[in-house]
A protein has these predicted regions:
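ADP-ribose/NAD+-binding catalytic cleft of ART/PARP-like enzymes
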Residues: 3-71, 85-86
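Active-site and NAD+-binding cores of ADP-ribose-processing enzymes
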Residues: 3-5, 18-22, 35, 45, ...
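Generic secondary-structure transition motif, activating predominantly at the C-termini of alpha-helices
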Residues: 58, 88, 158-161
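Short active-site loop/helix that positions an aromatic residue
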Residues: 77-91
Length: 170
């Protein structure tokens, strides 16, 4: 989910009226992540099977030529849908993205690219880990976004990159 900026949360349909003061939010760290309950989702272009592992150390779907040290996931379906759709859009493959139900195999933390940016806390429930994610299920029945919305998001992300503002904290 590293591609998503907090400024896009409202546009993407996330409820940013979280009714939370900054002092009420408890950051998710590698030391307390065991308190976070799934299910967890990962959206991608990769064709995987149950039991497969998703690991960091592979090229980013969104930043050509960059190898990521983390792998990203969410406990909300919406970020996974965007992840799947944008991975396919940037690959220009024309196929449908895939969403997997995953299980972290090690500690994880809040995704710093989204946490405490425009809104307090982590309203997208997005996380990252340096350990593999195990595929424990496949979600086939999910509602994607309109092609026009995906196109607008791709254009916005490309514009950020052109302006040197598409920085991924990995």
């Amino acid at each position: 989910m590293q591609w998503l900026r907090a400024a896009h949360l409202v546009t993407l349909g996330f409820n940013t009226d979280v009714g939370m003061r900054e002092d009420q939010w408890e950051p998710v760290t590698v030391d307390n992540c065991d308190k976070v309950r799934g299910p967890f989702y990962h959206g991608t272009k990769a064709d995987l099977s149950i039991g497969d592992l998703l690991s960091p150390g592979f090229p980013s779907n969104y930043d050509e030529g960059r190898v990521l040290n983390h792998i990203y996931f969410s406990s909300l379906l919406e970020p996974a849908i965007w992840g799947a759709e944008l991975a396919v859009a940037f690959a220009t493959s024309g196929e449908r993205g895939r969403i997997y139900i995953i299980e972290p195999t090690g500690p994880f933390e809040d995704d710093p690219n989204l946490t405490n940016k425009r809104f307090p806390g982590n309203p997208t429930k997005s996380y990252r880990t340096q350990k593999p994610l195990k595929v424990i299920g496949v979600l086939n029945d999910w509602q994607g976004h309109a092609e026009a919305d995906i196109h607008r998001m791709v254009e916005a992300l490309q514009d950020l990159k052109r302006r040197g503002r598409a920085i991924i904290e990995d």
